[in-house]
């Protein structure tokens, strides 16, 4: 996975020539979300991300991609397949293995009106570049009284994969959602990936785009509306994936799939679960969450990341502040184990929320008996 980058982005005159030849373009207006119609075909998350990048690069010459192995190798996960051949090495830039270096270059390019898309081979490596992300990209618009926009996307796989150890498995949703000036998106389906990435590239502010390695190869139904090149999803708006009346379940990224599986199991036991795909962590769609809780009177939050100071805690606080009198049961919060991710497969599974955990939590919220053996 960590093979040497095929090309190195130089400094000085070479970089200057590259940046000068990329012409800024007027940003496309944000498109309203389109209603989901009958599925026209299926698309993998990988294909959805690739097509979104391709179309946005075609529509706007100021958009360019940079990162380790994004060019000749076509990306560690093949998200940038075909883009080097189509757009050339000035817009698909292979970099050295120096996240701090190429992230700083990208932020500087965004200052000058370009629209960089920075790929991290894993978001764990974004820690090498966090000064540029937090202190440069996130704060510059505020510190310049709105005179400097930083239209940049930081994207790559986030969270647990399969047997890659503690230093390659962390979920950074809560980390980046804590920072004013950043927007944080967490796609689940192919529709999410395509619509949210397009919105992120068009946005005038820095966006952290957290993908999931285990979802890249998964296929989802996708409609003709979503395949339209003008399609984009609104940032800050959640999606109700499944309507229900007994309990609200919030989730993001891969956990949405687990929540839907749990809802199927619960329905066979007479519990109607409403599943909310958050899509956006910052801004968080508090209105949709609270409206659902006011209908179901119960809440279960799911996240893959550590429990303390997490997304679930923020959602719980929002419901306590806005809908406390509607709750008929204590909120149930499900999160990853409060330990670094183990390498052993059996321990790794125990450290990440599973479908059974969601089912048990929903039953507790609905005051349905849970066998003692199941809670052990």
UniProtKB/Swiss-Prot annotation:
It comes from the Eukaryota. InterPro entries: PDHB_mito-type (IPR027110), THDP-binding (IPR029061), Transketo_C/PFOR_II (IPR009014), Transketolase-like_Pyr-bd (IPR005475), Transketolase_C (IPR033248). This is Pyruvate dehydrogenase E1 component subunit beta-2, mitochondrial. GO terms for cellular component: mitochondrial matrix; pyruvate dehydrogenase complex. The pyruvate dehydrogenase complex catalyzes the overall conversion of pyruvate to acetyl-CoA and CO(2). It contains multiple copies of three enzymatic components: pyruvate dehydrogenase (E1), dihydrolipoamide acetyltransferase (E2) and lipoamide dehydrogenase (E3). It is an enzyme of class 1 (oxidoreductase). The keyword Transit peptide applies. Its cofactor is thiamine diphosphate. Pfam families: Transket_pyr (PF02779), Transketolase_C (PF02780). K(+) binds at residues 152, 200-201, 203. Its EC number is 1.2.4.1. The keyword ATP-binding does not apply.
């Amino acid at each position: 996975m960590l093979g040497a980058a095929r090309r190195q982005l130089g400094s000085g005159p070479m970089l200057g020539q590259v940046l000068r030849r990329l012409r800024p373009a007027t940003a496309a207006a944000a498109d309203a979300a389109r209603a989901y119609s009958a599925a026209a075909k299926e698309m993998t998350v990988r294909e959805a991300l690739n097509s979104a990048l391709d179309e946005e690069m075609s529509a706007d010459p100021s958009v360019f991609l940079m990162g380790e192995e994004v060019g000749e190798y076509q990306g560690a996960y093949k998200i940038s397949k075909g883009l080097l051949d189509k757009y050339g090495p000035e817009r698909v830039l292979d970099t050295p293995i120096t996240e701090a270096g190429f992230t700083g270059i990208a932020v500087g390019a965004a200052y000058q009106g370009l629209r960089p898309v920075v790929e991290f081979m894993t978001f764990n490596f974004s820690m090498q570049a966090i000064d540029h992300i937090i202190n440069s990209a996130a704060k510059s618009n505020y510190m310049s009284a709105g005179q400097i926009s930083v239209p940049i996307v930081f994207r790559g796989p986030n969270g647990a994969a399969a047997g890659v150890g503690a230093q390659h498995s962390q979920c950074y949703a809560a980390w980046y959602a804590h920072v004013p000036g950043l927007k944080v998106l967490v796609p689940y389906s192919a529709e999410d990936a395509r619509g949210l990435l397009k919105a992120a590239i068009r946005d005038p502010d820095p966006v952290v785009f957290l993908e999931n390695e285990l979802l890249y190869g998964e296929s989802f139904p996708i409609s003709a509306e979503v395949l339209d090149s003008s399609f984009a999803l609104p940032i800050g708006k959640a999606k109700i994936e499944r309507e229900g009346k007994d309990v609200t379940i919030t989730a993001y990224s891969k956990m949405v799939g687990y929540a839907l599986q749990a809802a199927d199991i619960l329905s066979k036991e007479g519990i109607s679960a409403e599943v909310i795909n958050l899509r956006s962590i910052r801004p968080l769609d508090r209105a949709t969450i609270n409206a659902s809780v006011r209908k179901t009177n119960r809440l279960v939050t799911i996240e893959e990341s550590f429990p303390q100071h997490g997304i679930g805690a923020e959602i719980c606080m929002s419901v306590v502040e806005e809908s406390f009198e509607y709750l008929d049961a204590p909120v149930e919060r499900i999160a990853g184990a409060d330990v670094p991710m183990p390498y052993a497969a059996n321990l790794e599974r125990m450290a990440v929320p599973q479908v059974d955990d969601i089912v048990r939590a929903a039953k507790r919220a609905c005051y349905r008996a849970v066998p003692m053996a199941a809670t052990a």
